[in-house]
């Protein structure tokens, strides 16, 4: 039964997704750049890229979402800040390290659930096991 639940979650995340940067703060899951059997960019990931592509103008959006966004938006924001400025991103990830909020993570066609703290701590480690910055 848990496998069916994961498949259903993956399908939901692939169809009901934000399409604009304004909706970024409510993203339902953390997606890597390639998801699903086709390895395509999801709308969730595209909303992250839409913000990140703003360059320096993305910082205030990421900073706001780091505090008030969904669990996935908080992680995307820390990752985005890291891509813009590794020092600020590291500080953001450290601020999330103790979070017990649950976040679905989609890599390829696999959906797993972790705490925000687990993902943040893993990204900070020298040898990440769950995700790496290259996935974003």
Each predicted region: which residue ranges?
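Short N-proximal segments of mature Sec-exported proteins
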Residues: 67-85
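Short coil turns that connect the paired helices of HEAT/ARM alpha-solenoid repeats
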Residues: 30, 37-38, 66-72, 95-111
């Amino acid at each position: 039964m848990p496998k069916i639940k994961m498949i259903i979650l993956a399908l939901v995340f692939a169809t009901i997704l934000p399409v604009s940067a304004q909706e970024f703060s409510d993203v339902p899951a953390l997606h890597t750049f390639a998801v699903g059997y086709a390895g395509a960019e999801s709308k969730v990931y595209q909303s992250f890229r839409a913000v990140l592509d703003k360059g320096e103008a993305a910082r205030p959006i990421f900073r706001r979402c780091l505090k008030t966004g969904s669990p996935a938006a908080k992680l995307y924001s820390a990752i985005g800040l890291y891509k813009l400025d590794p020092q600020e991103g590291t500080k953001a990830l450290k601020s999330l390290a103790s979070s017990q909020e649950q976040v679905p993570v989609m890599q390829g066609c696999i959906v797993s659930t972790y705490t925000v703290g687990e993902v943040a701590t893993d990204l900070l480690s020298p040898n990440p096991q769950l995700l790496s910055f290259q996935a974003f």
